[in-house]
Amino acid sequence: MITQERLLKVLRAPHISEKATMAAEKANTIVFKVAKDATKKEIKAAVEQLFEVEVKSVNTLITKGKTKRQGLRQGRRSDVKKAYVTLKEGQDLDFVGGAE
């Protein structure tokens, strides 16, 4: 069993972008930035326990950090792991709910 402390460290933040918003509307999929060492089972357990929803599937990917320059100095942004979490039919999770 995964500890409560580990579940809180797995999910970093929701990833809000145009592509993520379209995925949420069309496929009932939520995108999260997650810890680099997180597994799909840990991500599924964390979402189900923290948000009280049922997860259908989890797809993960690692986006490589971009190379950036400032004058003569060159640096690199960190790599980020993202998880596309598809919820079961009838489940809903809204991060960007509009004010009424």
Swiss-Prot record:
<comment type="subunit">
    <text>Part of the 50S ribosomal subunit. Contacts protein L29, and trigger factor when it is bound to the ribosome.</text>
</comment>
<keyword id="KW-0687">Ribonucleoprotein</keyword>
<dbReference type="InterPro" id="IPR013025">
    <property type="entry name" value="Ribosomal_uL23-like"/>
</dbReference>
<keyword id="KW-0694">RNA-binding</keyword>
<protein>
    <recommendedName>
        <fullName>Large ribosomal subunit protein uL23</fullName>
    </recommendedName>
</protein>
<dbReference type="InterPro" id="IPR012677">
    <property type="entry name" value="Nucleotide-bd_a/b_plait_sf"/>
</dbReference>
<comment type="similarity">
    <text>Belongs to the universal ribosomal protein uL23 family.</text>
</comment>
<dbReference type="InterPro" id="IPR001014">
    <property type="entry name" value="Ribosomal_uL23_CS"/>
</dbReference>
<dbReference type="GO" id="GO:0006412">
    <property type="term" value="P:translation"/>
</dbReference>
<dbReference type="GO" id="GO:0005840">
    <property type="term" value="C:ribosome"/>
</dbReference>
<dbReference type="GO" id="GO:0003735">
    <property type="term" value="F:structural constituent of ribosome"/>
</dbReference>
<dbReference type="Pfam" id="PF00276">
    <property type="entry name" value="Ribosomal_L23"/>
</dbReference>
<keyword id="KW-0689">Ribosomal protein</keyword>
<dbReference type="GO" id="GO:0019843">
    <property type="term" value="F:rRNA binding"/>
</dbReference>
<keyword id="KW-0699">rRNA-binding</keyword>
<dbReference type="InterPro" id="IPR012678">
    <property type="entry name" value="Ribosomal_uL23/eL15/eS24_sf"/>
</dbReference>
<dbReference type="GO" id="GO:1990904">
    <property type="term" value="C:ribonucleoprotein complex"/>
</dbReference>
<comment type="function">
    <text>One of the early assembly proteins it binds 23S rRNA. One of the proteins that surrounds the polypeptide exit tunnel on the outside of the ribosome. Forms the main docking site for trigger factor binding to the ribosome.</text>
</comment>
